[in-house]
């Protein structure tokens, strides 16, 4: 293990509150700039901006008093920690560190884009609370990310989702007040998208956020996720592994990291059963959140150096192993990303390198899915001891 591994990789910022304010500031400062401008003509020194900002436009009483209290739930988004994988990574010649998006306020990486897409549309004057009806197709996590932001800002939200997604997703979405329309699971995300467009056309004052094509999706990862990984690894990351759903995470994060170091390798993950990025055909699979069955507009394939295929069964088994061996309760797509990272970590040419892997969502929202089916059935059969 490389010598730097022995030292904790801590943030340059003093408090989580400080870092979360910066998440909010960096997004607002960039609203008027297109993603291409951020990536091209304007050079943004993200490590210094993200870590050492010393002023904010206005300060609440809690900030003035020095209390470490967020002003609202949106300030809790981002700045998630990284942790090394240990037992499960035995046999790897590289070191693997997971970016724990499971520790977002609503437990998934989609909290970032739920916030960014709504704020971006507000700043452009396209939506307003109490008037606009937000509409979006989702596999669940983006819907949840939108639902808690919509609830906190006063929007009505209508979501379309394939009926194959977990029961927990339905419950959470409705708990936040979202209206949920289930679609034919055989049609996958394409069916959910089609239904959302139908609702949009028949609903007054409706606005669709279009996570698969909205530039605010990859932009927030370029502004926050990428800089966070770069900062927390002290720029020592060699390889990034991430699943491909909307394409936002891998595009925005990968683009930022490659700007810092062009030698960093960006590796995407897709289901074997729906391997469209590898030249295959779309098909049903069990890895919720990735493998939409089409190439999303937000995905910049030029950012990626490689795409690895992981089967549903492999992803499920790896996610279960992460809970048992690492104490990390994660979703199926995290299992897919972890296995891909482990495969890359065993390649001889990667000896001593640092691999970052994104764990997109928390496992508790998969309790009714195949991921924990055997455990659930066992628990349902349990009887009290008399």
Curated annotation (Swiss-Prot):
CDD domains reported for this sequence: CBS_like
Any Gene Ontology CC annotation: cytoplasm
Transit peptide residues according to the UniProt entry: 1-52
UniProt cofactor(s): pyridoxal 5'-phosphate
GO molecular function, one term: cysteine synthase activity
Keywords in alphabetical order: Amino-acid biosynthesis, Chloroplast, Chromoplast, Cysteine biosynthesis, Plastid, Pyridoxal phosphate, Transferase, Transit peptide
The keyword Acetylation is assigned to this record: no
Residues modified as N6-(pyridoxal phosphate)lysine: 110
Signal peptide: none
Subcellular location: Plastid, Chloroplast stroma; Plastid, Chromoplast
Lineage: superkingdom: Eukaryota
Pfam families on file: PALP
Similarity section: Belongs to the cysteine synthase/cystathionine beta-synthase family.
Name this polypeptide is given: Cysteine synthase, chloroplastic/chromoplastic
Source taxonomy: Eukaryota, Viridiplantae, Streptophyta, Embryophyta, Tracheophyta
């Amino acid at each position: 293990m490389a010598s730097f591994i022995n030292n904790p990789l801590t943030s340059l910022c003093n408090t989580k509150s400080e870092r979360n304010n910066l998440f909010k500031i960096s997004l607002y400062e960039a609203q008027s700039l297109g993603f291409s401008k951020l990536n091209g003509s304007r050079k943004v020194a993200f490590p210094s901006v993200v870590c050492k900002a010393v002023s904010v436009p206005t300060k609440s009483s809690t900030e003035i008093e020095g209390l470490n209290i967020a002003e609202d739930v949106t300030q809790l988004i981002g700045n998630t920690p990284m942790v090394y994988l240990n037992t499960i990574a035995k046999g790897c010649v590289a070191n693997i560190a997971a970016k724990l998006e499971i520790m977002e306020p609503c437990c998934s990486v989609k909290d970032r884009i739920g916030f960014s897409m709504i704020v971006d549309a507000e700043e452009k004057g396209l939506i307003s609370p109490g008037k606009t009806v937000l509409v979006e197709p989702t596999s669940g996590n983006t819907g949840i990310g939108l639902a808690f932001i919509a609830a906190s800002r006063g929007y009505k939200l209508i979501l379309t989702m394939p009926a194959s997604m977990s029961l927990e997703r339905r419950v959470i979405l409705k708990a936040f007040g979202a209206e949920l329309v289930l679609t034919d699971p055989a049609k996958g995300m394409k069916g959910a998208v089609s239904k959302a467009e139908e609702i949009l056309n028949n609903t007054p004052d409706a606005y669709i956020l279009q996570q698969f094509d909205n530039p605010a999706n990859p932009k927030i990862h370029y502004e926050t996720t990428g800089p966070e990984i770069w900062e927390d690894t002290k720029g020592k990351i060699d390889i990034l592994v991430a699943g491909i759903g909307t394409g936002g995470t891998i595009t925005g994060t990968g683009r930022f990291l490659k700007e810092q170091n062009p030698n960093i390798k960006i590796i995407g993950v897709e289901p074997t059963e729906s391997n469209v990025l590898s030249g295959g055909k779309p098909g049903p699979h069990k890895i919720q959140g990735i493998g939409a069955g089409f190439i999303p507009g937000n995905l910049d394939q030029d950012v990626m150096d490689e795409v690895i295929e992981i089967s549903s069964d492999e992803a499920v088994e790896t996610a279960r192993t992460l809970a048992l061996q690492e104490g990390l309760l994660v979703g199926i797509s995290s299992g897919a990303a972890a296995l891909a990272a482990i495969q890359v970590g065993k390649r001889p040419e990667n000896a001593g390198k640092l691999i970052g892997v994104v764990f997109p969502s928390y496992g508790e929202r998969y309790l009714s899915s195949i991921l924990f089916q055997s455990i659930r059935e066992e628990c349902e059969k349990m009887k009290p001891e008399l």
